[in-house]
């Protein structure tokens, strides 16, 4: 038997915390089916929207970064990315800004290759992924705040081995390379919502 999943109706919303990088909200919502008129509490994190970019040089190397991540207390291998700041006119602009700030690299064109919702059970944001071909370094990185980043150039055809071996574990980076594969195979045309 097939049935349609309906949206829940939010009846209350209370901000619990307002941190620098996210706010936390408790929402009370009515279940549309099943236990009629029964309300449940849900907690939602509201971080900024995010972006990341796969920069590939003319000689086929991916510009990765290594940085320490406090959530897992380890150094991770990632691609450049970060928050879409309120003053950024678009996530594409933010991706170019993050690429430049974190690596000193630029690209003539950033191509949108996909959008994901990092954790829709708990978070309200999305992450847009861009491809930057012919990326070239024009200066040293300009780190801001608590950033401590090392650039690492890796041959594009080595990336699957890094993923399979567990050297790359950041979910948004894994999704980015999946988007790249779809883009290269020309399966569909992604569009931001």
Residue ranges, per PLM feature:
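Active-site-adjacent beta-strand/loop module that shapes the phosphate/pyrophosphate-binding cleft
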Residues: 28-33, 119-139
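Acidic, metal-coordinating catalytic segment for phosphate/diphosphate chemistry
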Residues: 13-52, 58
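Conserved Nudix-box catalytic region and its N-terminal flanking loop in Nudix hydrolases
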Residues: 5-7, 45-47, 52-97, 145
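Short, solvent-exposed loop/turn elements at beta->coil junctions and helix N-caps
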Residues: 13-15, 115-119
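Short loop segments at secondary-structure junctions
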Residues: 32-34, 57-59, 68, 88, ...
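A short coil-to-beta-strand element that immediately follows conserved catalytic motifs
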Residues: 9-10, 106-113
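Short aromatic/basic micro-patch
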Residues: 78, 129, 153
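Nudix hydrolase/Nudix homology domain
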Residues: 2-10, 75, 145-193
